[in-house]
């Protein structure tokens, strides 16, 4: 679900210093729905 993508995005942002890579993964996640 999209909610899973949002949760994964927040976890990524919290644990990584590369927001760009997090948002790329987020958009790929949304496209897979």
From Swiss-Prot:
The entry's keywords: Antibiotic, Antimicrobial, Disulfide bond, Fungicide, Secreted
Record flagged with keyword Secreted: yes
Superkingdom to which the source organism belongs: Eukaryota
Compartment(s): Secreted
Disulfide bond in keyword set: yes
PTM entry text: Contains two disulfide bonds. Up to two of the methionines may be oxidized to methionine sulfoxides.
GO biological process, one term: defense response to bacterium
A GO CC term assigned to this protein in UniProt: extracellular region
Protein function: Has antibacterial activity against Gram-negative bacteria E.coli JM109 and DH5-alpha, H.influenza IID 983, and V.vulnificus RIMD 2219009. Has antibacterial activity against Gram-positive bacteria S.aureus IID 1677, B.subtilis RIMD 0225014 and L.monocytogenes VIU206. Possesses antifungal activity against S.cerevisiae A581A, S.pombe IFO 1628, C.albicans ATCC 36232 and TIMM-1623, and C.tropicalis TIMM-0313.
Protein's name according to its UniProt entry: Dolabellanin-B2
């Amino acid at each position: 679900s999209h909610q899973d993508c949002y949760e994964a995005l927040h976890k990524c942002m919290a644990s990584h210093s590369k927001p760009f890579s997090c948002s790329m993964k987020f958009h790929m996640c949304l496209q897979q729905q």
